[in-house]
Amino acid sequence: MRHVQAETSPSSEPEAGPSQPAVRQGALQGGLLMGYSPAGGATSPGVYQVSIFSPPAGASEPPRALKRPAPPTEGPRELKRGPGLGAREGLSPEEPPTVGLLGPEGLGLKLGVASQHFCHHGLCVVEQGGSSTSPWTSGARSSPLPPSNASCSTLHTRDWASPDPRGQGSLGSSLGPAPPGQLHTLDTDLHSLAQIGGKSLVSGVGNGGSPWPRESPGTANGCSPEHTPPGPGPPGPCPTKRRLLPAGEALDVSSEDEGPAPRRRRGTLGHPPAANSSDAKATPFWSHLLPGPKEPVLDPTDCNPMGRRLKGARRLKLSSLRSLRKGPGLLSPPSASPVPAPAVSRTLLGNFEESLLRGRFAPSGRIEGFTAEIGASGSYCPQHVTLPVTVTFFDVSEQNAPAPFLGVVDLSPLGRKGYSVPKVGTIQVTLFNPNQTVVKMFLVTFDFSDMPAAHMTFLRHRLFLVPVGEEGNAGPTRRLLCYLLHLRFRSSRSGRLSLHGDIRLLFSRRSLELDTGLPYELQAVTEAPHNPRYSPLP
């Protein structure tokens, strides 16, 4: 069931039109004209009820409703709007009970001072208001409907101008016939009433008519129109309720409509998208009351680099003060932006040997399972230890030349002090392959008796293949490096000597291909730094 509420005010006698005869003089003074054309003939199930309120015409007779039988169905019906002011010329007083039907195409209802009740094929108009001596009130009467039909919560209030006595700018004159073949529903007509009302007011002023002075619906009677009972009121504009519009559509209403202040309308522009939806049924009516998103307040210091730098320094100072408040035991350095680590240079060093020992070549692979046994002898013999060896190999030549292996023995599992050795003695390092076969045993003699406390140095032990008889005169081009052992020593503050860091080894993956015509022998060379020989600990 759909409801619409409209209130009209009394007006003078309307003029007779040339299209219909004069009838119901004094009974139907102005009003609204609505039509309903069923799409399915006499079997349409939809029923619409329209309640119109008007001041009584001087009679104390209680409001009553009149039910009329449905007219015979005559093919498809179309909606036609007729004049909406009083009686028209061309209608005889003896019009049959089907008065209100403008021909067989549709149904036209004329609503005057005395409200009428009709029931025609899905349309029901209920009379609520004063009675009048009109042919519409003759016949069987039913009990009046409760006043609950007078309210409709889905409509907004809107001012309507009363019809002009001369018929200019009236609602009836602004309504035109619908295009042929177009079927209208009552819902569409009800929603179009608000726009038609606004247009009629403007046209009335343009033709010289003086519309009724407007006043706010909330101040007309001293109370809200929603809580005002239907009844006679002042001859001012009667508020009519219309459907709620979403916040986005409320801005499109013409300037004659009553609406929120301009400041309120501008505030609705910042609503979330859900409040600006065009679906009024899915949008809550209070969405325009929601607060808009707050714009972030920008600090003037954020606009320049100097301000940002000062703000960062202020934050660092505050954080340091908080840490000082916690106590000296909990003092932590102020948090600053992380300093990027220096880029590690991967350029090659002066020779191939140094580049391999420093890791300047990218390894081609890694071999697991190598181990190294470390021992020492001298003024005392420390316990031998066995540690894993990380072995990597390289592909540094396009030819089939052999490339050495690089083995690294990490001494960190032995503790911070490393592997303790005497100041004068011999160090033995034995390398085992994954099959636990000895690859090479290194024996290195050292003498660091003059090494001061808290200093460090290193030893590099090499094994070359040189031709026999050229041990002392063999040049670098005649020597072939076979094995290399790099040891690092450190003296503690108490003067104790130990191996620290790691031990690095170079060895060949297979036997060297030598010229069989010349005999070769191994030559061991141990080197240490000369100037300075010892360096202080960092």
From Swiss-Prot:
What does the UniProt record say this protein does?
Transcription regulator that may syncronize transcriptional and translational programs.
Region named Transactivation domain 1 (TAD1): 436-444
Q: Which domain of life is it from?
A: Eukaryota
Q: What is its main location?
A: nucleus
Q: Where is the composition biased (Polar residues)?
A: 1-12, 129-141
Family to which the UniProt record says this protein belongs: Belongs to the ATOS family.
Task: Output the PANTHER family linked to this UniProt entry.
Answer: ATOS HOMOLOG PROTEIN B, GH03947P
Q: Does the keyword Nucleus apply?
A: yes
Q: What is this protein called?
A: Atos homolog protein B
- In the UniProt record, the gene name given for this protein reads ATOSB
Q: Which organism is it from?
A: Bos taurus (Bovine)
**Does Kinase show up as a keyword for this record?**
no
Ranges where the record places region Required for macropage invasion: 348-430
Residues with Phosphoserine modification: 254-255
User: Any domain commentary?
Assistant: The protein contains a transactivation domain (TAD) which may be required for transcriptional activation of a subset of target genes.
